Amino acid sequence: MLDLKNLQNNFDEVAKKLKNKKVDENILKKLAELFASLKKEKIALEEFQAFQNKFSKELATAEDKESLKAKLSENKSKINEQSAKVNALENELEEIAHAIPNIPDECVPVGEDENENVELKKVLNPPSFDFTPKEHFELGESLNWLDFIRGVKISQSRFCVLKNEGALLSRALVNYMIDFNRSRGFEFVNVPFLVNGATMFGTGQLPKFKEDMYKVDDEDLYLISTSEIPVTNLYSGEILASETLPIKMTCYSACFRKEAGSAGRDTRGIIRQHQFEKVELVSITKTEQSDSVFNEMLECASDLLSSLGLAHRHLMLCTGDLGFSAAKTVDLEVWLPGQNKYREISSVSNCRDFQARRAKIRYKNEQGKNELVHTLNGSSLAVGRTLVAIMENYQDKEGKIHIPDVLKKYF
């Protein structure tokens, strides 16, 4: 959640940044009106409170005590009424603020959508083929690695069954990713895939994205869309010791997304599924640590792709493509020769103190004061898309898939 005090004190500047992130102008106008009303009602409340304080002290020496008591009683009722007005405005303001995204960093390019994201660099050269490379779903069906028909039969569309060497390769990737991330100093944690509403709120999924979540009927439980959600919230409501930071974690999980806005996109294959697997990086840092830890996380995910021999590029997301909780995001896109283009395989984001304010994660700084932490997250990597990338990049003209050397010991 945004710092409401900063929003109120620097409204025009913050509102301009939020417009770049596609926040509705009517919502910003409503916020401005609420801030003005709240200021007015707080002044009135302070006047009533000042009257109460002043004349309460004079009551003992007043000549007409009964008259003053009556005035103080009447004023106390006004204080209660005015406090209720202020509380109602603060609650309305906070409710609207819950659906307002994070402010983009100064380095984030202003743009409308993914077409205005900025390429930062390319890593490795895409492979060349003396034949027309196939897409992963063609390879997967011919090798009996991917069973879409039975996936749909037991579930619905956008579900797939992995079989034979395809399932083994997926498992090998998970183990390799966890080991690689641990070698870079990230502690492995294993968390529940079902979390409560407060946890979903803490990382920004609720209330704005409620319709995109899978919820258990009659229970306050949601299936996670990313392990960022439970891992970040491991420390919700806590005050951490300064010397314990940064906390750097990696986690494997299944992820569940309705993909409501993706009708007609990636309808073939396993690029976009309702259930998929991901190995995540999550870090909790002091303010001054978050930029360097962001670079560490980005380097970890990029080096992991390089270790698999997969050509990829770094993209800085523009304001219009930036996620709800993120202040800055760099996407990694892997080269898929079957599609003849780069596709997203990782997003590394710095959320600054936005999630920490919602989840109430703080640390005691060197001056002994409680300060909000910064939270960061990133995929290292999306398992299914890495499987896709290996299938397409390591295929031969006979339709066989060669396994990267670093994975062979995991079979």
Swiss-Prot record:
GO terms for cellular component: cytoplasm. L-serine binds at residues 226-228, 280, 379. Its EC number is 6.1.1.11. The keyword Disulfide bond does not apply. Pathway: Aminoacyl-tRNA biosynthesis; selenocysteinyl-tRNA(Sec) biosynthesis; L-seryl-tRNA(Sec) from L-serine and tRNA(Sec): step 1/1. It comes from the Bacteria. ATP binds at residues 257-259, 344-347. One of its GO terms (biological process) is seryl-tRNA aminoacylation. Its main location: cytoplasm. One of its GO terms (molecular function) is serine-tRNA ligase activity. Keywords: Aminoacyl-tRNA synthetase, ATP-binding, Cytoplasm, Ligase, Nucleotide-binding, Protein biosynthesis. It is found in: Cytoplasm. Gene3D superfamilies: Bira Bifunctional Protein, Domain 2, Serine-tRNA synthetase, tRNA binding domain. InterPro entries: aa-tRNA-synt_IIb, aa-tRNA-synth_II, aa-tRNA-synth_II/BPL/LPL, Ser-tRNA-ligase_type_1, Ser-tRNA-synth_1_N, SerRS_1_N_sf, SerRS_core, tRNA-bd_arm. It catalyses: tRNA(Ser) + L-serine + ATP = L-seryl-tRNA(Ser) + AMP + diphosphate + H(+); tRNA(Sec) + L-serine + ATP = L-seryl-tRNA(Sec) + AMP + diphosphate + H(+). Belongs to the class-II aminoacyl-tRNA synthetase family. Type-1 seryl-tRNA synthetase subfamily. Consists of two distinct domains, a catalytic core and a N-terminal extension that is involved in tRNA binding. Homodimer. The tRNA molecule binds across the dimer. Catalyzes the attachment of serine to tRNA(Ser). Is also able to aminoacylate tRNA(Sec) with serine, to form the misacylated tRNA L-seryl-tRNA(Sec), which will be further converted into selenocysteinyl-tRNA(Sec). This is Serine--tRNA ligase. It comes from Campylobacter jejuni (strain RM1221).
